């Protein structure tokens, strides 16, 4: 597929997402007025918009589970980050209500803004005050038995093809303080469909392969999020990533 066609495909994808967002906007506007009451509705619309957008342009998701997942409990979902499609992957994957924690710049995006003003958690990483507020919101969310999705690398890799980079500790401190199980998610090849925001290489139809590893407990023995928890999650995700991305 030529770069020109990939650019056309990218514009088609963005157009599809915008179309479904505008289609659902009257409902979103209403639900956003009282997000605590309509949390599940907002999560549902976020999922519907993102999945409808990829289906229209021929992108599919295939998930392989290392062990069966009990979606009746909440998790801290830790996923690698190589593409804006990673958000859609987690919307597809998580069967229970959850919030994203993401960079504050997502408040500038006309589509993600309404979600990061209501159900998702924006954080300005270079601000200690913003980071603390986001941390407290995340703990409150988990205490309400909702799940939280975090990309522990902190950003999409600047290099192509991408690698799995060392994790930041935030996700593991949050999980340990609330003793919430971590669910490692390895998104193997979203970057081959659409790397980063697509501006460099465009996008194309295809299947995104995802490996969900066995949940990892952050029990009482790990109250302070010892480096061993972070290292264990990273090692297992790195191993799964390397098997697919040789």
Locate predicted features.
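Glycine-rich helix-loop-beta junction characteristic of Rossmann-like nucleotide cofactor-binding loops
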Residues: 66-70
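Short gly/ser/thr-rich secondary-structure transition/capping motifs
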Residues: 56-64, 131-132, 192-195
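Short acidic-hydrophobic, aromatic-tinged amphipathic segments that line or gate anion-handling sites
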Residues: 63, 121-125, 218
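A transmembrane-helix-recognition feature enriched in membrane-embedded lipid enzymes
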Residues: 2-62, 114-118
């Amino acid at each position: 597929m030529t770069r020109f066609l990939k650019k056309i495909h990218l514009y088609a994808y963005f157009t599809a997402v915008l179309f479904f967002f505008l289609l659902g906007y009257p409902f979103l506007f209403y639900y956003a007025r009282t997000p605590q009451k309509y949390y599940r509705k907002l999560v549902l619309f976020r999922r519907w918009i993102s999945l409808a957008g990829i289906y229209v342009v021929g992108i599919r998701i295939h998930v392989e589970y290392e062990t069966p997942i009990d979606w009746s409990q909440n998790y801290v979902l830790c996923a690698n980050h190589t593409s804006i499609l990673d958000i859609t992957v987690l919307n597809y994957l998580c069967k229970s209500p959850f919030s994203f924690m993401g960079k504050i710049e997502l408040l500038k995006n006309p589509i993600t803004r309404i979600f990061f003003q209501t159900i998702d958690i924006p954080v300005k990483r270079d601000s200690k005050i913003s980071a603390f507020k986001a941390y407290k919101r995340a703990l409150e969310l988990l205490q309400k038995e909702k799940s939280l999705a975090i990309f522990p690398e902190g950003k999409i890799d600047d290099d192509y093809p991408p690698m799995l980079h060392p994790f930041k500790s935030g996700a593991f401190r949050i999980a340990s303080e609330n003793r919430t199980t971590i669910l490692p998610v390895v998104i193997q090849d979203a970057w081959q469909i659409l790397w980063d925001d697509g501006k460099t290489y465009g996008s194309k139809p295809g299947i995104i392969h995802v490996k969900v590893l066995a949940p990892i407990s952050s029990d009482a023995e790990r109250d302070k999020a010892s480096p061993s928890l972070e290292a264990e999650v990273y090692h297992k995700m790195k191993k799964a990533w390397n098997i697919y991305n040789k």
